[in-house]
Structures are given as structure tokens and as C-alpha cells.
Design a protein with these regions (language model features):
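Protease-labile, long low-complexity intrinsically disordered regions enriched in Pro/Ser/Thr
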Residues: 21-218
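Repetitive helical segments and hydrophobic/amphipathic motifs
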Residues: 11-12
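C-terminal motif of bacterial Sec signal peptides marking the signal peptidase cleavage site
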Residues: 15-18
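Positively charged n-region of N-terminal signal peptides that target proteins for export
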Residues: 1-4
Length: 218
């Protein structure tokens, strides 16, 4: 009998914790959240003239998908000024793709709480400020919007050093300009208040590398 009562008390506590999760977040936004995966980072290469480029990734986690395949831990492609990438077999690609699982803690001390129905407009504006061109922003939005727009709210924070410190790219020859846009986000049932994040501008010059990706925090 005592054991049964103990189980019932534990179950009740678990239910209360689950019911108050959003209320706690509303009162005080979570600063660090842990993702299940880093979803769809893609890398575009834009040299001024056609050149051979090698890209390697040092990732603090487990890679779950890579396309095209790496050889000896790196991609080796011929990059054209329009962004077309060609491998040794002659196959062409628009970008390099990878996905992985890590225990990185993403920073939500600043960011944005966006109503689900406003997500497309928000992303168009934010990605333009960050420096993605129209094609890159379109591919970003088409990937993420179906997961976000039906939510009542989305908590969004773009990650910079927090992301790049655990997913390090080495590119040879070294680019003149590198932009890495990574969005960590979480669906919410109620809004939260947090300081708005300042989004840095980016200038494309010479050999430019652009990456975008994101992680949904469940």
C-alpha cells in the first residue's frame, strides 16, 4: 500500500512538472537548451574564378548524414563563381550538406519570440539582415517554415560562437569572407519576453563561403 501511494505521488509530480514547463519559460526564458540534432547545415562556395577547394569539418558530435560523401574526412570539389560544385566524377551539386547529433548547449539569453503565422516574414527580414542572398534565404525558409508556421509561437535565437566553436570548418584555399547562419529554435504554446538579438551585417568580398543550418529544440 505504501509503495502504491509513493508511485502515485511520483506520477503526480511528473504531471505537474510537464504542465508548468511553458509557464516557467514564460516567466523566465531558458538561457541554454540542448538539441537532439543539428539539422541541415549546408555550405555554398563562391570563388571569384573556378578553383579546387577542400572543405573539412571538425565536429563535436556524431555525423549522421553527409552529402556528397567525404573522402578522408573532407570534401574536395571544383567550385565555380555561380556556386556550382563539381566532384572528381563530374557530378554537380548546389552545396555541401551535413547533419549530426551533439550535446551543444545553445544560448537563448537573447533572441526573438515570433508568432507562428509571422515566421515567414520574420525570417525573410532576419536572413536578409544577416547576409543571405535570395536563393539561400529561400532554401532556408522552404526547409524550416513547414515546421514552424503552425506553432502558436517560436522562440528563435541565431547562434554564432556557440555554434561555430563546436562545428569547425577548415577550407583551403582560405575564403576572403565566411558567413555561418545557424538558427536554434523551439516551439512554444505561450509567448515569452527576452532581449532582442542584434543581427550583424555581412559583406561578401572575394572568395565567399556561406553556410546556413539550424536545430529544433524539443
Amino acid at each position: 500500500m505504501k509503495r502504491t501511494i509513493l508511485y502515485l505521488m511520483l506520477a503526480a509530480l511528473a504531471l505537474l512538472a510537464g504542465c508548468t514547463q511553458d509557464e516557467e519559460l514564460s516567466a523566465k526564458p531558458v538561457i541554454y537548451l540542448y538539441p537532439e540534432s543539428d539539422a541541415k547545415p549546408v555550405d555554398y562556395l563562391y570563388p571569384e574564378a573556378e578553383m579546387e577547394v577542400t572543405v573539412s569539418l571538425d565536429y563535436d558530435g556524431e555525423l549522421t548524414c553527409v552529402y556528397p560523401a567525404m573522402e578522408n574526412g573532407a570534401w574536395s570539389v571544383t567550385a565555380s563563381p555561380d556556386g556550382t560544385l563539381t566532384d572528381a566524377s563530374g557530378q554537380t551539386y548546389n552545396y555541401l550538406y551535413w547533419e549530426g547529433v551533439s550535446a551543444t548547449a545553445y544560448d537563448f539569453s537573447q533572441g526573438f519570440c515570433v508568432p507562428g503565422g509571422d515566421t515567414a516574414a520574420f525570417l525573410e527580414d532576419a536572413l536578409s539582415q544577416l547576409g543571405l542572398n535570395r536563393r539561400e534565404a529561400n532554401e532556408f525558409i522552404v526547409y524550416w517554415l513547414p515546421r514552424m508556421e503552425a506553432n502558436p509561437y517560436n522562440l528563435i535565437a541565431f547562434q554564432f560562437d556557440t555554434y561555430t566553436d563546436h562545428a569547425r570548418l577548415t577550407i583551403t584555399p582560405e575564403p576572403d569572407a565566411t558567413l555561418r547562419v545557424f538558427m536554434a529554435w523551439r516551439p512554444l504554446s505561450t509567448p515569452v519576453e527576452l532581449p532582442a538579438q542584434e543581427l550583424p551585417a555581412f559583406e561578401r568580398t572575394g572568395f565567399t563561403v556561406v553556410e546556413w543550418g539550424g536545430a529544433e529544440i524539443s
